Amino acid sequence: QVLVLDGRGHLLGRLAAIVAKQVLLGRKVVVVRCEGINISGNFYRNKLKYLAFLRKRMNTNPSRGPYHFRAPSRIFWRTVRGMLPHKTKRGQAALDRLKVFDGIPPPYDKKKRMVVPAALKVVRLKLTGKFXYLGRL
């Protein structure tokens, strides 16, 4: 059974942690609307952190990595990868069970999309708390 999650209004790290646990347990997880995922902290601060990440590269041959994905779905995918033992067979199999999309592509637009209450912004941040959208980053 495939778990279809709607990323909009969820916090990046909390959603990623829950998704990572589920794929390790053997569930297939699909996350749609990754551009609507929230990150706590204001946009300027998150932008500085992301730009600092963009500066990290291999001096001798930058094309060998680290790879800096710009698309919101890939940023989320990488966040989940950091929570998995992705260099082991088990971790790779878990990553294969995860699919991420910006927007809602055809097979999933008809399916029921779930939310994760533990990762929702409205639950976790104060009403005045600052946050940024992954899509803007």
Curated annotation (Swiss-Prot):
Modified residues (Phosphoserine): S73
Keywords: Citrullination, Cytoplasm, Phosphoprotein, Ribonucleoprotein, Ribosomal protein, Translation regulation
Transmembrane segments: none
Post-translational modification: Phosphorylation at Ser-73 upon interferon-gamma treatment in macrophages involves a DAPK1-DAPK3 kinase cascade and is causing release from the ribosome, association with the GAIT complex and subsequent involvement in transcript-selective translation inhibition.
Gene3D superfamilies xrefs: Ribosomal protein L13
Pfam families: Ribosomal_L13
Subcellular location: Cytoplasm
Keyword Ribonucleoprotein recorded: yes
Superkingdom to which the source organism belongs: Eukaryota
A cellular-component GO term for this protein: ribosome
Modification Citrulline, positions: R55, R136
A Gene Ontology biological process term: negative regulation of translation
Molecular-function GO term, any one: structural constituent of ribosome
Subunit and interaction comment: Component of the 60S ribosome. Component of the GAIT complex. Interacts with EIF4G1.
PANTHER family linked to this entry: LARGE RIBOSOMAL SUBUNIT PROTEIN UL13, RIBOSOMAL PROTEIN L13
Family from the record: Belongs to the universal ribosomal protein uL13 family.
Reported function: Associated with ribosomes but is not required for canonical ribosome function and has extra-ribosomal functions. Component of the GAIT (gamma interferon-activated inhibitor of translation) complex which mediates interferon-gamma-induced transcript-selective translation inhibition in inflammation processes. Upon interferon-gamma activation and subsequent phosphorylation dissociates from the ribosome and assembles into the GAIT complex which binds to stem loop-containing GAIT elements in the 3'-UTR of diverse inflammatory mRNAs (such as ceruplasmin) and suppresses their translation.
Protein name: Large ribosomal subunit protein uL13
